[in-house]
Regions:
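A short SAM/SAH-binding and catalytic strip from SAM-dependent methyltransferases
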Residues: 162-176, 191
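Class I SAM-dependent methyltransferase SAM/SAH-binding core
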Residues: 97-100, 104-154
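Conserved Class I S-adenosyl-L-methionine
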Residues: 201-223
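N-terminal auxiliary segments of SAM/dcSAM-dependent transferases
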Residues: 1-52
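Class I SAM-dependent methyltransferase Rossmann-like catalytic core
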Residues: 49, 54-78, 82
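C-terminal helical/coil "lid" or tail adjacent to the Rossmann-like core of SAM-dependent
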Residues: 233-248
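Conserved beta-strand signature within the Rossmann-like core of class I S-adenosyl-L-methionine
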Residues: 184-192
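A short acidic, Gly/Pro-enriched loop at the edge of an enzyme's catalytic core
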Residues: 153-164
Length: 248
């Protein structure tokens, strides 16, 4: 069955809803054409501090190579399970509206889409990232989703559109997250654990350090659950360069 079309976006210039399939247009006639790879550029030029914001093309390529090799498979499966467990659509027969803020090249989204397909649950997935090379890859790899180049701190997403918001290792834009989530919506916030990539740090640094882990209260949000995902992987020499290059 072909998925129903959906448009999660609002105009980044005036905030009005965007409508359309390939060409998006708002009520004030601002228009945005879909790139050939299947994404929209919804980051206004005046909001770009550099010519190519976000992760570089080289970093994106390295991350894609490493993730596609399956080393983070345990994490991808856990994300799918969490989204199935915590995602609740607004209506009984409605698809889940899932928004990935800081989607990167979309590997996590593909894991989630696979989990929903296997569970027979409908999902409408949208994601954005400030790095155009990453969004280009995400859109090509998962055509059923909607992707845009955009900033977390000025999200071109309709107010209250998201049932479930995913934020993996990306900046926490508290006010915008609260705006785009519907009342009663939920967020999955992923942060690195204390020993995330610790073995790699032990190779790189004379005095390796653990990531600080602390409880942080975010206004408008309350914790309803926590899950720690851990595992040990063996990375062959040929993939070490990709692991180093993908890490900021």
């Amino acid at each position: 069955m072909k998925p129903e079309p959906f448009t999660p976006w609002q105009c980044p210039l005036c905030g009005e809803p965007l409508t359309g399939d390939t060409a998006l247009k708002c009520g004030r006639n601002h228009s945005f054409d879909r790139a050939k790879e299947g994404y929209w550029h919804l980051l206004p030029v005046q909001s770009m501090r550099t010519k190519a914001p976000g992760d570089s093309k080289e970093m994106v390529a390295a991350r894609r190579a490493f993730l596609n090799a399956g080393y983070y498979g345990i994490f991808g499966r856990a994300l799918g399970e969490l989204c199935l467990a915590y995602g609740a659509a607004a209506g009984a027969d409605a698809p889940l509206h899932l928004l990935d803020a800081g989607c990167g090249e979309g590997w996590y989204d593909r894991c989630i889409a696979q989990a929903f397909a296997q569970a027979g649950r409908p999902v409408q997935l949208a994601g954005f990232d400030i790095a155009k090379p990453a969004v280009r890859l995400a859109a090509k790899a998962l055509p059923a989703a909607k992707y845009a180049v955009a900033s977390s701190f000025a999200q071109p997403v309709r107010t209250g559109w998201a049932d479930l918001l995913l934020n993996c290792f990306s900046p926490f834009a508290q006010e915008e997250f609260r705006r785009v989530l519907r009342p009663g919506g939920r967020m999955i916030y992923v942060v690195p654990g204390a020993e995330h990539l610790y073995q790699m740090k032990a190779v790189l640094y004379d005095t390796p350090y653990k990531n600080p882990v602390q409880e942080v209260a975010y206004e408008g949000f309350r914790p309803i659950g926590e899950r720690e995902v851990s595992g040990r992987i063996t990375v062959p020499a040929g993939q070490l360069e990709a692991l180093f290059a993908m890490t900021p």
